[in-house]
Amino acid sequence: MDVKHIAKQTTKTLISYLTYQAVRTVIGQLAETDPPRSLWLHQFTSQESIQDGERYLEALFREQPDLGFRILTVREHLAEMVADYLPEMLRAGIQQANLQQRCQQLERMTQVSEANVENSNLETPE
């Protein structure tokens, strides 16, 4: 297991997600202050894949550099706000999700075992 590679890929995914959130934030801000630009950014976003945040921003900078810089600023602000909470929330979230999965699997296994016992009791002649 290459932990460094996993960390890099996780970081890339998180950066793209924060880019997505920054775009949503800017679209919302523009909807209140400049509806035509909000509509333009919304349409641009529907045409350009935001899956890779960096490629999305490169395309946006070619079209509307000021919006690109605005999204960079919002993304950086979001990263600063989230960074303090993320490690503990990640650990707690994984632990909780794993616990729920284990409980559900145990319930399924128990139900299957009970069904097998009931079926074997029905098949046993008395």
Swiss-Prot record:
InterPro entries: Chaperonin_RbcX_sf, Chaperonin_RcbX, RbcX
A single Gene Ontology CC term: cytoplasm
UniProt keywords, alphabetically: Bacterial microcompartment, Carbon dioxide fixation, Carboxysome, Chaperone, Cytoplasm, Photosynthesis
Location of this chain's protein in the cell: Carboxysome; Cytoplasm
Family annotation (Pfam families): RbcX
Gene Ontology MF terms in the entry: protein folding chaperone
Gene Ontology biological-process annotations: carbon fixation; photosynthesis; ribulose bisphosphate carboxylase complex assembly
Free-text comment about domains: The homodimer has 2 functional domains, a central cleft essential for production of soluble RbcL in which the RbcL peptide binds, and a polar surface which plays a role in correct RbcL subunit arrangement.
Family: Belongs to the RbcX family.
Function: An RbcL-specific chaperone. Required for assembly of the RbcL8 core. The central cleft of the RbcX homodimer (RbcX2) binds the C-terminus of a RbcL monomer, stabilizing the C-terminus and probably preventing its reassociation with chaperonin GroEL-ES. At the same time the peripheral region of RbcX2 binds a second RbcL monomer, bridging the RbcL homodimers in the correct orientation. The RbcX2(2)-bound RbcL dimers then assemble into the RbcL8 core (RbcL8-(RbcX2)8). RbcS binding triggers the release of RbcX2.
Quaternary structure and partners: Homodimer. Interacts with the exposed C-terminal peptide of RbcL via its central cleft, contacts a second RbcL monomer via its peripheral polar surface.
Name of the protein described by the UniProt record: RuBisCO chaperone RbcX
Species this protein is from: Thermosynechococcus vestitus (strain NIES-2133 / IAM M-273 / BP-1)
